[in-house]
């Protein structure tokens, strides 16, 4: 049955995540020997901190989309495989969650000033998460993490095919439809409190077995930008 197949898949993916995390760490250590360093945003030089403060102020903050979710505000649509910063905001009443999109056409890899032959970088979602308090001014942030939702990609092409539209229009319609299908996975950059997790699971209609906590970047496609700079 499909439900049993999905349960087996979720179980196996959970087993593979520690292997992925260990492999990523080993590769990063090897890259550091080649002077290619994914910097920890909490352990930067003063020069790097000043550079990133200015970068955030001029290149990121003006273009942020931040949402506050509580009884008065609806839950936003989370795009398929897009990264968001999620924060628990201090509130005397019900659970208040803040969400910031990290995909508003930002340059994903931020290269830091470095000596010739060295490549130091962070990812834009790490910068947005670091400065999450600036996206929710007036609120105290109690906890924060990065998250990424994967939506179901299983669509019936024949069912969605309109004979009155040409092939390109049909495919465009199907792709847009797929982007809005139900969530099947929630990735997190760290463990979050049950309060926030349960709120997300309720809104996304997911179960705990569909939650995956990973120590690696939630989207690994950024490596191509690093490779391009290294080989240029």
PLM regions with names:
Residues 186-204, 210-224:
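Extended, H/D-rich, highly charged conserved domains that either
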